[in-house]
Amino acid sequence: MPEGPSVRKFHHLVSPFVGQQVVKTGGSSKKLNPTSFQSLWLQDSQVHGKKLFLRFDPDEEAVSLGNSLLSEPLREGEQKDKARHHQEASDPSSWSPGGDSAVPSGDDGLQCLGGDTPAGGAERWLQVSFGLFGSIRVNEFSRAKKANKRGDWRDPVPRLVLHFSGSGFLAFYNCQMTWRFSSPVVSPASDILSEKFHRGQALEALGREQPICYTLLDQRYFSGLGNIIKNEALFRAGIHPLSPGSLLGLPRLEALVDHVVAFSADWLQGKFQGTRQHTQIYQKEQCPAGHQVVRESLGPPGGFQRLTWWCPQCQPRLSADEPKQLQPS
């Protein structure tokens, strides 16, 4: 799945089409009928963690009518969600990881109403969640780089193609799309690429007793962080992926957060400059020091297991009886 920097790049590609009308559609999507986008206007584009949100509206007269018909329960629900997320972002002490409102691990805290088709006149946002090789192409289609398992050189088929009034088009590949009938309500405090990323909230989450590699992938606290960033940040901080966060001193946790933010920002900058991000441990057989790298699938019991690379020498595992003050810095 594309991580935060990649989805930010997709958002950058889509932004020039905001304000244009869809004049032609295509694609293989079965869940969403591509023709349902015909004549809609792309009015806004937002990115939150690993998800992209696109707002589509009919003409202004229809939008005005739809907003006036929006039910009061829906409006009240949106206001409550916005108020709660604002409180969490401004006052981390009000946030409770064990409360009933907690979002399951792996969710990035988005609160929306969903469905397969847009309600007439209601505010409609298309939520785009990308698969492992998900992407967006502008004014071009993806071409096969190698033969498939059957030996065919077939080009990938886009899920959705939108041609706009400005003569350009967008092609969406390997993604899931769902209509949302209210604005995405999120807390930028959890977005690792946001200027409002809340380090204190992140450090509190990392200090748990569970293996630190589990916490890093929890989108409630590190929205946009994926497997590549996880592996690279842990290696650069010299932390074993299975080390419980509670055994790590604050300086090491702060260093880990620094590496998460720095690596993510460098990756994003490279995306815009067209350069490939350099990795030191991800998918490597040896670390930069020449040590043999271990690869293993790690994840919470009953949860999703992710391939993890680490160097046993550069990232020694901590024992429960090791005093924090004696841990390597």
Swiss-Prot record:
Its Enzyme Commission number? 3.2.2.-, 4.2.99.18
Write down which residues bear the modification named Phosphoserine.
68
Q: Where is this region: Disordered?
A: 68-116
Q: Which GO terms describe its molecular function?
A: class I DNA-(apurinic or apyrimidinic site) endonuclease activity; damaged DNA binding; DNA N-glycosylase activity; zinc ion binding
Which stretches does UniProt call biased (Basic and acidic residues)?
A: 73-89
Q: What is its main location?
A: nucleus
Q: Which residues carry this modification: N6-acetyllysine?
A: 50, 149
Q: Which reaction does it catalyse?
A: 2'-deoxyribonucleotide-(2'-deoxyribose 5'-phosphate)-2'-deoxyribonucleotide-DNA = a 3'-end 2'-deoxyribonucleotide-(2,3-dehydro-2,3-deoxyribose 5'-phosphate)-DNA + a 5'-end 5'-phospho-2'-deoxyribonucleoside-DNA + H(+)
Q: Which CDD domains match?
A: MeNeil2_N (cd08968)
Superkingdom of origin organism? Eukaryota
Q: Name one GO cellular component term.
A: nucleus
Compositionally biased tracts (Low complexity)? 90-102
Q: Keyword annotations for this protein?
A: Acetylation, DNA damage, DNA repair, DNA-binding, Glycosidase, Hydrolase, Lyase, Metal-binding, Multifunctional enzyme, Nucleus, Phosphoprotein, Zinc, Zinc-finger
Compartments where located: Nucleus
GO BP annotations, alphabetical order: base-excision repair
Zinc finger (FPG-type) residue numbers: 280-316
Tell me which residues bind DNA: 227
SMART domains in the cross-refs: H2TH
Signal sequence bounds = none
- Activity regulation (record text): Acetylation of Lys-50 leads to loss of DNA nicking activity.
Note what the entry says on domains.
The zinc-finger domain is important for DNA binding.
Q: Record's PANTHER family?
A: ENDONUCLEASE 8-LIKE 2, FORMAMIDOPYRIMIDINE-DNA GLYCOSYLASE
Annotated function: Involved in base excision repair of DNA damaged by oxidation or by mutagenic agents. Has DNA glycosylase activity towards 5-hydroxyuracil and other oxidized derivatives of cytosine with a preference for mismatched double-stranded DNA (DNA bubbles). Has low or no DNA glycosylase activity towards thymine glycol, 2-hydroxyadenine, hypoxanthine and 8-oxoguanine. Has AP (apurinic/apyrimidinic) lyase activity and introduces nicks in the DNA strand. Cleaves the DNA backbone by beta-delta elimination to generate a single-strand break at the site of the removed base with both 3'- and 5'-phosphates.
Q: Which family does it belong to?
A: Belongs to the FPG family.
How is this protein organized at the quaternary level? Binds EP300.
This one is known as Endonuclease 8-like 2
As recorded in Swiss-Prot or TrEMBL, the protein's gene is named NEIL2
